[in-house]
Amino acid sequence: MRGSNNTDLFDPKTEMDSNFSRHGSSSEGDFGFAFNDSNFSDRLLRIEILGGPSDSRSDAEGCTSIADWARHRKRRREDNKKDNGVAISDIVACAEEQILTDNNQPDMDDAPGGDNLDDEGEAMVEEALSGDDDASSEPNWGIDCSTVVRVKELHISSPILAAKSPFFYKLFSNGMRESEQRHVTLRISAQEEGALMELLNFMYSNSLSVTTAPALLDVLMAADKFEVASCMRYCSRLLRNMPMTPDSALLYLELPSSVLMAEAVQPLTDAAKQFLASRYKDITKFHDEVMALPLAGIEAILSSDDLQIASEDAVYDFVLKWARGQYSSLEDRREILGSRLALYIRFPYMTCRKLKKVLTCSDFEHEVASKQVLEALFFKAEAPHRQRILAAEGSDSMNRRFIERAYKYRPVKVVEFELPRPQCVVYLDLKREECAGLFPSGRVYSQAFHLGGQGFFLSAHCNMDQQSSFHCFGLFLGMQEKGAVSFGVDYEFAARDKSTKEEYVSKYKGNYTFTGGKAVGYRNLFGIPWTSFIAEDSQHFINGILHLRAELTIKRSSDLH
């Protein structure tokens, strides 16, 4: 009777879910001794291998690197599509596997001797391509699918395969007559043969004999096709432990969109992102390489907090340059910037001068630019503790726009006045760790700020006090532009102090006539040794932050005489 004795091996909702959620295979039983052994098997798996001699090599054969594997796979896929319409071996884009029956054949129950045919009947499984649900018709692959170049028969245990794979579980427990038949036929392309044999062996032994990256990728793709998540995770782990290259990392980034079970390869994808972010953290050092990277690689680099770059303004400029180089169409550029790359630019840490330029940049849709600039300005207007809260809230999410990167030039807050004289107040905050890292002779620069059309910057130093011969903390004010420009400025340095209820206390005042490239300041801003300045009980760090302020006022022409 059809389906009368088809009892589930186990409840799929509980047992299989727990099995597929495991992240390793070491704790699972080793049934390698039962592989292809009739004594421990209840079915016979017939593997029909299709294709001609040109199709006999797998993607991994002859490949010495990931790049070779990717090129081989891409070339074969394109050749098959060009010559045959559809690639039989394209397991990346395969549709759901279906059981094929022939509706024109008589019902087996009505056939002569039907009661005795269960052991001899076969369930045939092959790819159902192009979404056609009519499984009774032979799919047209553009090659002679009736040509079976090889046949392999294996003794299999349906409980072992079903426990590892929802594909085989459905095949063996779907209530149809085929699930009760002892013979099951799989029809595959010649390129898949080696990977499938490795996969079947893994389902018994939880181990693989292949060790190269191309071969592991073949097995991983086969595991995805036959829904063996544990094997995908195993391959992913082995690939993560191998030396990575830019080519392999970029290939791994594409896996989630190329496989059905993307979660199984997520750790490998994350490792690829970390590799690219670490390798290209100084994008100026690898400028040409980075400019040639695809979108996924650029996103991996821009997502890093450790990007070694002068400022977020420089990140913005780089993104625009890359987008213009990759997308000649303004419409395409706006689409990719608005929907993808804008998410990785941390607009709240851009200078106001650059944010103004964002609003008039034709590469961004006006609505996108306005939204990003308004959000950035609101963030800048928040109190420091609110900014820290916003940054903490975004630290676990994909969108890290409120988190400050490790910029080469430290961000500053600037308040500008035009009357009664051009003036600006500049706030620079330094973490205790940043200050500690300056010892014994380091320096850190602020981002540029502007007054009277001239660019200025602050720099914090660890100096040797020339009079007392000990290290100390110094602060300097410099002008960017070099040349014969003469610029008179009144300045004042101040810092917050615990002893004065955390108010800003003036440290030094002075005036200086700048010429391009010159700087003025104080080698020992606090008048104490470095050890006292950096000590745990230091009065100058409030919640681990050193708060500095500089006021600059342009001298009137009458003041210069």
From Swiss-Prot:
PANTHER family: BTB DOMAIN-CONTAINING PROTEIN (PTHR46336:SF8), OS02G0260700 PROTEIN (PTHR46336). Residues 1-31, 100-119 are annotated as: Disordered. Residues 266-358 form the BACK domain. May act as a substrate-specific adapter of an E3 ubiquitin-protein ligase complex (CUL3-RBX1-BTB) which mediates the ubiquitination and subsequent proteasomal degradation of target proteins. GO terms for biological process: protein ubiquitination; response to red light. Pathway: Protein modification; protein ubiquitination. Residues 107-119 have a biased composition (Acidic residues). The keyword Nucleus does not apply. The BTB/POZ domain mediates the interaction with some component of ubiquitin ligase complexes. GO terms for molecular function: protein heterodimerization activity; protein homodimerization activity. InterPro entries: BACK, BTB/POZ_dom, POB1-like, SKP1/BTB/POZ_sf, TRAF-like. SUPFAM superfamilies: POZ domain, TRAF domain-like. It comes from the Eukaryota. The lineage of its organism: Eukaryota, Viridiplantae, Streptophyta, Embryophyta, Tracheophyta. This is BTB/POZ domain-containing protein At2g46260.
